[in-house]
Amino acid sequence: MATAAASAREQLREDERPGEPLHASFYARPVLEVARELVGCVVEHDGASGVIVETEAYHESEPACHAFVGLTERTRPLFGDPGRAYVYRSYGIHAMLNAVCDEQGVGAAVLIRALEPLTGVERMRARRGMADAAESELCSGPGKLAQALAIELDRNECDLREGPVVIRARPRAWSEPQILVSERVGITKASELPWRFSAAGNAHVSSPRPRALPS
């Protein structure tokens, strides 16, 4: 599959091609920094990829984060090595992809909320069962993007540098995205925190659309 992914990247314009997989040191920083800087990076898995256009930060200090309850079997990955995936199922239905951040022993992660499809779009359509849908509908939410990329719970704790889920550095076309900062959505606790980061004006972000000034 790595060969197929490399072949797909070669078909892109030079300024669309993502950089190298992000090193663990990228993630070993405060979660708010990582959440902002992941916007514009590229997620690859199983023959498809997309540019991250929306993220949310979660930290053990606030009650919307799974790590708020402390170390349990479920939350153990959140306290582990930065740069690994934390994948869980929401409401028993949708897989959610997160990148573990901060120092080992600190429970923090970035939820990948939306992607702009880059390669493997027809695979995404088939996986979503949406043959005629607009591209902007394919990955405009965390459950949608996991389904489009065929990410399931068996990817929990995978190394995001080595794969099979890989996050790569921003393509040149995304070197300096304009970022909107707004409140997190879809949660009932600590929803007032401005920990949602999205690419300004991008059609692929999730609903409700962020309403904030660039910062």
Give a label for each model feature.
Residues 2-215:
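Conserved, well-structured core segments that form or line functional sites
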